[in-house]
Amino acid sequence: MRQTFMANESNIERKWYVIDAEGKTLGRLSSEVAAILRGKNKVTYTPHVDTGDYVIVINASKIHFTGNKERDKMYYRHSNHPGGIKSISAGELKANNPERLLENSIKGMLPSTRLGEKQGKKLFVYGGAEHPHTAQQPENYELRG
C-alpha cells in the first residue's frame, strides 16, 4: 500500500525567483507571489510544512491599479492611542513607500500563523530594478496572467 508523500525540512528544495512588477496589477501579482511563497506551485506541497520558494519582487514602484483604486483605496493603521488612527491612500503609499504597499498586499494573503510568518520572511521587495541577491542566482519567473 502506498502512502501519501509528506514533505519535511530534509527533502525540500528551495529556488529563488525574480518577478518584475512593472505594469502588473497589484492583486493578481500578490496572489501568485503568495502561492509561490506557500509552495502551492509544487507537487510536493504539504499544508503544515513550509515548502515555498524565495521571491524577489523588483520595480514595485511601477505597480498598476485598476479603476480609481489609486485615489479611492485607503490603508489604515492605529497607534493604540485614543484618536491615533492614520489613513493613507494607495497612490500616496505607492509614491512614498511602494515596498510596503506590495508587502502588505502579499502578506495579507498568507496565513496569520507562525507558519505564515515564516513564509513571509522569504519575500524581498525592492522599488527599483536592482536587488542585492545576485549571489543566489535567482531565476526569472513569468506570471500566468
Swiss-Prot record:
Annotated family: Belongs to the universal ribosomal protein uL13 family.
UniProt entry tagged with the keyword Coiled coil: no
GO molecular function, one term: mRNA binding
UniProt-listed SUPFAM superfamilies: Ribosomal protein L13
Pfam families the UniProt entry points to: Ribosomal_L13
Annotated InterPro entries: Ribosomal_uL13, Ribosomal_uL13_bac-type, Ribosomal_uL13_CS, Ribosomal_uL13_sf
HAMAP family (UniProt xref): Ribosomal_uL13
Function: This protein is one of the early assembly proteins of the 50S ribosomal subunit, although it is not seen to bind rRNA by itself. It is important during the early stages of 50S assembly.
Protein species of origin: Staphylococcus saprophyticus subsp. saprophyticus (strain ATCC 15305 / DSM 20229 / NCIMB 8711 / NCTC 7292 / S-41)
Record-level GO cellular component terms: cytosolic large ribosomal subunit
Keyword annotations: Ribonucleoprotein, Ribosomal protein
Subunit structure: Part of the 50S ribosomal subunit.
GO biological process: negative regulation of translation; translation
Protein name: Large ribosomal subunit protein uL13
